[in-house]
Swiss-Prot record:
Reaction catalyzed: GDP-alpha-D-perosamine + 2-oxoglutarate = GDP-4-dehydro-alpha-D-rhamnose + L-glutamate
Family matches, as PANTHER family: DTDP-4-AMINO-4,6-DIDEOXYGALACTOSE TRANSAMINASE, TRANSAMINASE
Family: Belongs to the DegT/DnrJ/EryC1 family.
Modified residues (N6-(pyridoxal phosphate)lysine): K186
Enzyme Commission designation: 2.6.1.102
Protein name as it appears in the record: GDP-perosamine synthase
Regions that span the bilayer: none
Subunit structure: Homodimer.
Gene ablation phenotype (knockout): Mutant produces altered S-LPS.
């Protein structure tokens, strides 16, 4: 084990107004799901994404579920989802009684392969869920074109992509709606929390109604529909607003970290493949994701263990949905790239608090364990 301080794979940066805003919630006793910070956070986030509406939720998974329900996704429907994603993307579809249909990914960006969408569409297909994996927006033009041609809804899973851009537009502004996560390891955090963005007035109103148990906003304790308790607390929103105030600083700090990786990984030669950045926009690098080169005697999982012994935390790329028990029945022969990325993909420490010396340690450790 290393005697040096441990380098975490992710860490929140809480050096703005977070403490002052949380104390205001406590001093005013507005600690639950009503308060000024919820209103201000929603408005500020909508403005940041360039959309009309932002609906705060208690986490990113409930944001996905709420959006799908509001869009009318239900039993018998199909939603196309990448196999290589965090399981919440597929689970949210399953919660609705609908069926996730899995699409393979691009080997360079890790995002879904838009060229493979058309073959998966059936009369039951109702929506496409492009997941902006690890901070880079999917190639949205062909996805939106397929959706228009087949009259399908598009919900962006932008959990990992706050601040990312595609052809001059921010994540959250490209589909019919989009969802975000503010878990503690995300680009901005509320501890736990989520957000939905949309330009659709009716959809926003329905999501707000469903979020608060379905209570009529003009008639207290009258419930015209069955809803959910997916509300964010004022304390969560207070942290989120403080985080959003400094998001540009957070992203700039991440870009410095990425620059160090890009420069220093040359030392490792073909033992790793660096992430591909598309020319269509800004990659915000929620995670700096590499693939291990061919011909190594070690494995990705062994590399993670060896790095851990040297005081450096890393993470595997997400396991594809179709190799895990809940979704193994959805496996097809056309998900091979997702499988390969799931075997050799590795997420290195990526957060705004890292120093150049930290990255030097990571590179030196990789040089030692990649054999």
């Amino acid at each position: 084990m290393s005697d040096l301080p441990r380098i975490s794979v992710a860490a929140p940066r809480l050096d703005g107004n977070e403490r002052d805003y949380v104390l205001e919630c406590m001093d005013t006793t507005w600690i639950s799901s009503v308060g000024r910070f919820i209103v201000e956070f929603e408005k500020a986030f909508a403005d940041y994404c360039g959309v009309k509406h932002a609906i705060a939720c208690n986490n990113g998974t409930t944001a996905l579920h709420l959006a799908l329900v509001a869009m009318g996704i239900g039993p018998g429907d199909e939603v196309i989802v990448p196999s290589l994603t965090y399981i919440a993307s597929a689970n949210s579809v399953t919660y609705c009684g609908a069926t996730p249909v899995l699409v393979d990914n691009d080997p360079r960006t890790f995002n879904l392969d838009a060229a493979k969408l058309e073959a998966l569409i059936t009369p039951r297909t109702k929506a496409i869920m492009p997941v902006h994996l690890y901070g880079q927006i999917c190639d949205m033009d062909p996805i939106l074109e397929v959706a228009r041609r087949h009259n399908l809804l598009v919900i962006e899973d932008a959990a990992e992509a706050v601040g990312a851009t595609y052809r001059g537009k921010k994540s959250g502004s490209l589909g019919d709606c989009a969802t975000f996560s503010f878990f503690g390891n995300k680009i901005i955090t509320t501890g736990e929390g989520g957000m939905i963005t949309t330009n659709d007035d009716d959809l926003a109103a329905k999501m707000r109604l469903l979020r608060g148990q379905g209570m009529d906003p003009n008639r207290r304790y009258w419930f015209p529909i069955v809803g959910f308790n997916y509300r964010m607390t004022n304390i969560q929103a207070a942290i989120g607003l403080a985080q959003l105030e400094r998001v540009d600083e957070h992203l700039a700090a991440r870009e410095r970290v990425v620059g160090w990786y890009e420069q220093k990984l040359a030392r490792l030669g073909n033992r790793v493949t660096k992430p591909h950045v598309a020319l269509t926009g800004r990659h915000v690098f929620w995670m700096y994701t590499v693939r291990l080169g061919e011909g190594l005697s070690t494995t990705r999982d062994q590399v993670i263990k060896d790095l851990d012994a040297l005081g450096i935390e890393s993470r595997p790329v997400f396991h594809p949905m179709h190799i895990m028990p809940p979704y193994a029945h959805l496996a097809t022969d056309d998900l091979k790239i997702a499988e390969a990325c799931g075997v050799d993909g590795l997420n290195l420490p990526t957060h705004a608090g890292l120093t150049e010396a930290d990255i030097d340690r990571v590179i030196a450790a990789l040089d030692q364990v990649l054999v």
